[in-house]
Amino acid sequence: YKQKYIPYGEKKPYVILEDSNQIEYRIYDDMENVFIKDFLPTDDLAFDMNMHILSFEPGGCHPFVETHVQEHGMYILTGEGMYLLDDTWMGIKKDDFVWFGAYCPQCAYGVGREPFAYIYSKDCNRDVTI
């Protein structure tokens, strides 16, 4: 992840030390079979990026195909899933790493018998400089 921090006025980010096992999952996008853990506050504009764990129960999926202006990557923590990158579906599993280019259409769903979970980084709270 290579990006210089982009300040927001006088707000300053601060150090957060947490164990991912101590962070509670919350329901993602009103779906009862997809859950998210946020490592940084999602409501504090001092932070220009975040780290999350997204976990899909078997059959759980993104609610739509999405794209992002930023590049980002993900590391698969558990299970297996199918992931759409551009126009290709590919199987991914625990210990795989995936890098997404900007504007690459993407979505996922969990397959198998255990949750499909991955950790990922993502820019947030800043407009893209054009």
Name every feature range the model reports, one short phrase each:
Residues 1, 102-128:
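Ligand-binding loop in jelly-roll beta-barrel domains
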Residues 1-49, 130:
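A short, N-terminal "cap"/entry segment at the start of jelly-roll beta-barrel domains
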Residues 31, 44-48, 68, 92, ...:
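A generic fold-level signal
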Residues 33-40, 52-68, 89, 101-104:
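Conserved short histidine dyad/triad with adjacent acidic residue
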Residues 40, 57, 77, 93, ...:
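Residue-level detector of conserved, well-ordered beta-strand and adjacent loop positions
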Residues 53-57, 66-85, 121:
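Short, conserved beta-strand element in jelly-roll/cupin
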Residues 73, 86-102:
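Short acidic-glycine-tyrosine-enriched beta hairpin
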